[in-house]
Amino acid sequence: IFLNSSLFIFAVGLLVLRLIKYLIRLIYRIGKKRWSPAVYASFLQITRTVKKQGFISVFLVMTIAMGMFNSNMARTINDNKTKRINYNLGTDLVVQEQWTRGTYIDKKKKTHWYYTEGDFERYTKLEGSVCDKVTRVIYDDDAVIKAGGEELAGSVLMGINTKEFGETARLQSGLNKEHWYNYLNDLAEVSNGVIISSNLAKKYNIKVGDSINYARYSPMKGKEKEEIASPSGTVCAIVDAFPGFQQYVYQKNSDGEMEEVERYLVVANYAYVVSAFSQTPYQVWMRLADGKSYKDALRAIDAEDINIVQYDSLDKDIKEMQESPLVLITNGLFSLSFIIAIILCMVGFLIYWITSIKQRELMFGIYRAMGMSMHEINKMLINEQIFSSVLASLAGYGVGVAATILFVKLVAVVYLPEAHNIAISIAVDPYDLIKLTAVVIFMFIVCFIVIRTILKKMNITQALKLGED
């Protein structure tokens, strides 16, 4: 894919340069009778040396186009990874407290279990200090959904308080047909209501208003899994995406190979889930206050003597992603390739123009002998730069845009091969374009300064005498 994108940039660069040549000829003919001697001479030089300038012009196009392509590629990979991490977690911080489980035996010698819930106010006390909002979320990724006469094991069940959850969780806009708050409002109106994922609805042709059953297994380990209960739920809404729900996960099969597993979602009211399955351990989702980090929240939790057995932090996950070897190598590779291309382009640019000016020293003397001032000679060189180097640079931006549209998503698939609720989207930051433009302008300024210095040191006086002769 990288080779194809490079060949595409090279081929389109050649095509664009051919079009630029015809554009220059058109401009030359339009003002042929009105150009000043300096401008006229510059157009003659451009049209006569178009083949010689072709190499450096192609280099300019490829350098700028590859710089833009690599920049957009790195931005797309980083942004899409960040979006997926944000979606997978659903909020800033998710903590799991250690719960105490007890058992007892009834008169029929049947074993029962129960959990002792800690005081949730220990978390709500953190609101206004390190957190803006906290909420309880029952999350079970080993639930069973019963629909269409079949059972879907390994499904995801979430029990939420709709108002608190809406204030705590986050979801990228545009993933559902309407704002996800509307789905929460629909769920809040029906005590036994459920929100289901669109893949479940499509699989069994379920519509809003239909009923499904879902079940959870007992936490007591035995030879066979035992269902706690199998309540019925009325479908209130169907969603394509929901905070914290990963539709696709990757697990090892019996052969030890990773395989894609599609999961299904049921979201129910927290109180209804507790009444149906008894009190079970839940996650605490936290939206951090501005300026507060997950470490601040963990310290505050520790100060409340809360025993946390597991936590997931958005900032921590994003930082680990940014510091992962794959991302670091990719970003470093793109940056290094652009720096090398800029250096080679600058060196080639200088070599070409220094050689060209040295070869035209006698010609400059003739122009001076004909009455052309140094100011007009400088004007002639500037015009040559505009219609050769600057136009090629602008063409590079156009080619870079085309390459970004056609190839960035394809290359991003290599770095983000997993199926996900969030499709890969091209990310372009105007600031990256500004930085690229600044580097290119700096390169041109350095080259112009060097060329100007060489031009001043040229022995124009001797060339002038030769021109007069």
Positions of the model-derived regions?
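Alpha-helical transmembrane segments, especially those used as permease/efflux helices
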Residues: I1-M73, L391-L394, K435-F448
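"Rare, low-scoring activations can occur
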Residues: C236-D240, Y264-P325
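Peri-transmembrane interface segments
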Residues: F2-L7, D296-C345, S356-Q359, M380
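Transmembrane helix boundary and interhelical loop/hinge segments in multi-pass membrane proteins
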Residues: L23, A38-V39, S356-G365, K457
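Interfacial "coupling" helices/loops that link adjacent transmembrane helices in transporter permeases
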Residues: V347-S389
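Alpha-helical transmembrane segments
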Residues: F2, L19-K21, G54, A65-T91, ...
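Short beta-strand boundary microenvironments
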Residues: K83-D92, Q98-S218, I228-A241, N253-E257, ...
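Short helix-loop junctions at transmembrane helix boundaries
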Residues: I1-F2, V327-T330, K379, L394-Q462
